[in-house]
Amino acid sequence: MKVDKEYLRLFPNLNVSYNLRENLIARGALYTSVGRPDYNQYAGGLTLPDTERVPDSASNRISVNNAGIKAWSANTSKVRLEYYFERVGQVSVAAFRRDFRNFFGSVVLPATPEFLSLYGLDPETYEKYSVATNYNLTTSVRMEGLEFDYKQALTFLPNWARGVQAFANATATRATGDGVANMAGWTPRLFNWGVSLTRPKYNLRVNWNYASRRRAGLVAVGRSIEPNTYDWRSKKLNIDVSGEYWLSKRVALFANLRNINDALDDIERAGPSTPAGAQLRQRNDYGSLWTFGIKGVF
């Protein structure tokens, strides 16, 4: 199989800014962008599931690459207001609207006899597995959102707390249009915040990362599966801690503790009439990853 693709395009953009005050700036932008699919899509072929595991449309399934998939394009308009604290940080708010063309969609289908025959797969082995693939949406998709960003060195604290910095950012988005039902993977709410302490000999950082519940993909209608049934990834809050201690100008000890609250990764399946207590399909417990080491600067 040979697939030819080219991305020779013009991407015009316009950026303007206006100083409302010495430390208050208004910005606006109009721009175009493109999103290329994973290059593995152009290889064609398929990935088979682990036949020793239970079939699962969210993870253990047949995946088919789409060599004919196109890159999506988008037109975006954005406004932003930025306020600067003198020498110690900034806070900003922004709003945007993005209209997509040929956006990526995903679908999960049953393994039909025709599909199994096309790829030469044994029906007795693979007919119980779902088939997942990607394609370009032919319908419209619009994404609208708000953004907030804050970062500041807390110089107003007492002398014993010198070196403390705080940050927070948030993104809230919504998708509208005929193609929204086939969208997968976007997260409506993202929140990140944290605090750090920096001293000449050491530094310490604590970060919180929150992602809201997000849709993973449409599930094909089948036995006991009603229309408009989707797989979902549950909301999750991760807490990470990291730090360094310098033994000398060139050598330091470091620690990186990921997911210290041991947040679970749940996969749910829900249709219009699925009770809340019956939505949990899979629970992954990856635990907390702790890394310690020594580093040098040469």
Predicted regions and their residues:
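Signature of Gram-negative outer-membrane beta-barrel scaffolds
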Residues: 1-23, 37, 54-58
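Outer-membrane beta-barrel signature, preferentially recognizing the C-terminal barrel domain
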Residues: 5, 34-100, 121-153, 186-187, ...
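Residues on the lipid-exposed face of transmembrane beta-strands in outer-membrane beta-barrel proteins
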Residues: 14-18, 69, 79-83, 148-152, ...
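Short loop/turn motifs that connect adjacent beta-strands in outer-membrane beta-barrel proteins
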Residues: 23, 88, 155-164, 250
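Transmembrane beta-strands of outer-membrane beta-barrel proteins
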Residues: 26-28, 91-93, 162-168, 193, ...
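Flexible, surface-exposed loop regions and adjacent strand-edge segments
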Residues: 43-52, 107-117, 181-187, 212, ...
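Gram-negative outer-membrane beta-barrel transporters
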Residues: 97-99, 104, 109-111, 116-218, ...
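C-terminal beta-signal and adjacent terminal beta-strands/loops
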Residues: 101, 164, 212-222, 244-298
